[in-house]
């Protein structure tokens, strides 16, 4: 059994947490996040920490409590520090540039791709082959990074494509005659 839910989430200085029924709101220096917690989890805010307990009689209450703890911890870290994902473009002629709330991608197709960024996510290109996505919402920044990577995932023979900065692409050997 996982014991994730037994550890409380500490609230750092400058972060304010309000609980309204099953809806939790976290405010910090970088913004505000709100989430509705599953009814199988009892959440309490006391002594500068958020504590979680499963509701008695619910089958998967411990699992839901662990999930709620992880989600709320990500909210607290997001509003205090923020999250970022780095993408690399590997391939001849693969380029990216940011224009307002759009990321213009040239990935070897006959047409350029334009990816619209959702509200709350910012992008920058330190070079033509790098994209840095930032947000206070870990789930959202990961989703946007996955969507951009999905346009041209790294292929195993030459390694060309869009990859995460820390991703290792397994390479295959070419077919022998």
Swiss-Prot record:
SUPFAM superfamilies: Ribosomal protein L6. GO terms for biological process: cytoplasmic translation. It comes from the Bacteria. Pfam families: Ribosomal_L6 (PF00347). One of its GO terms (molecular function) is structural constituent of ribosome. The keyword rRNA-binding applies. Transmembrane segments: none annotated. InterPro entries: Ribosomal_uL6-like (IPR000702), Ribosomal_uL6-like_a/b-dom_sf (IPR036789), Ribosomal_uL6_a/b-dom (IPR020040), Ribosomal_uL6_bac-type (IPR019906), Ribosomal_uL6_CS (IPR002358). GO terms for cellular component: cytosolic large ribosomal subunit. Keywords: Ribonucleoprotein, Ribosomal protein, RNA-binding, rRNA-binding. PANTHER family: 60S/50S RIBOSOMAL PROTEIN L6/L9, LARGE RIBOSOMAL SUBUNIT PROTEIN UL6M. This protein binds to the 23S rRNA, and is important in its secondary structure. It is located near the subunit interface in the base of the L7/L12 stalk, and near the tRNA binding site of the peptidyltransferase center. HAMAP family: Ribosomal_uL6_B. Belongs to the universal ribosomal protein uL6 family. Part of the 50S ribosomal subunit. This is Large ribosomal subunit protein uL6. It comes from Shewanella amazonensis (strain ATCC BAA-1098 / SB2B). The gene is rplF.
